[in-house]
């Protein structure tokens, strides 16, 4: 039995219709949308002695899926499976697991805690092999109009012997690899006359723009001339 039920009012990729529909169950958006693109921000300074290891801001993409009994599994694109060149240590799991509630509270569905994801492969190029995530307080924006298409969270990031708690904001459909060069590319609706046969797929309620900040071009696009469509406001990031 799956946790994920499409509503009959879904007419766009971002499922952004039917404002007046009955209370929707807790949902997350599954891997076919490419996962959630995430901005990790370190509030304040890094722990003493960790300034050169913990980036102030960085980006990643997590694939999230759900199974029976409200179980939610997630995996970072930075962490490869052992058979794909990842960490061969069987005691280190690249999969995190949490529990999604049945119904939202005040429009939010919260996964309180996620098991550690770890891959000792230095994915950020810091020179330190140990790398781990421990997410907690994952708050998904719920309701028939949003259906878990964004979340905020706190994530304990471990690099080498250093650990710091980052604030995270995340958006789906994925923006990995780059999706824009101008703000017009972030329009959720297609405009064939302007050379955009497809829209961005992002919920039209979200305040987004094309950003080419360093955390984007360094960690997500690899190109200073290509950006991603991302929030311009803190969670819930609505217009």
What annotation goes with each model-predicted range?
Residues 8-12:
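Sec-dependent N-terminal signal peptides
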Residues 19-239:
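Mature soluble binding/inhibitory domains
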Residues 1-7:
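Bacterial N-terminal signal peptides that target proteins for export
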């Amino acid at each position: 039995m799956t946790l994920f039920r499409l509503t009959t009012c879904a007419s766009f990729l971002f499922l952004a219709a039917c404002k007046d529909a009955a209370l929707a169950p807790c949902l997350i958006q599954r891997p076919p949308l490419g996962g959630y693109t995430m901005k990790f921000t370190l509030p304040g300074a890094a722990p003493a002695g960790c300034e050169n290891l913990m980036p102030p801001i960085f980006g990643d993409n997590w694939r999230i899926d759900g199974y029976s009994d409200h179980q939610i599994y997630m995996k970072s694109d930075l962490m490869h499976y052992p058979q794909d060149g990842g960490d061969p240590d069987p005691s280190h799991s690249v999969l995190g697991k949490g529990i999604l509630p049945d119904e939202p509270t005040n429009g939010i569905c919260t996964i309180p805690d996620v098991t550690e994801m770890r891959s000792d492969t230095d994915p950020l190029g810091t020179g330190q092999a140990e790398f781990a995530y421990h997410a907690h307080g994952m708050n998904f924006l719920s309701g028939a109009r949003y259906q878990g298409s964004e979340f905020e969270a706190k994530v304990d990031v471990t690099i080498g012997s250093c650990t710091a708690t980052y604030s995270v904001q995340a958006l789906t459909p994925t923006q990995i690899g780059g999706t824009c060069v101008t703000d017009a590319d972030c329009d959720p609706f297609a405009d064939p006359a302007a050379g955009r046969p497809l829209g961005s797929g992002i919920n039209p309620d979200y305040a987004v723009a094309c950003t080419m900040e360093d955390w984007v071009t360094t960690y997500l696009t690899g190109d200073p001339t290509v950006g991603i469509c991302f929030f311009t406001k803190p969670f819930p990031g609505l217009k």
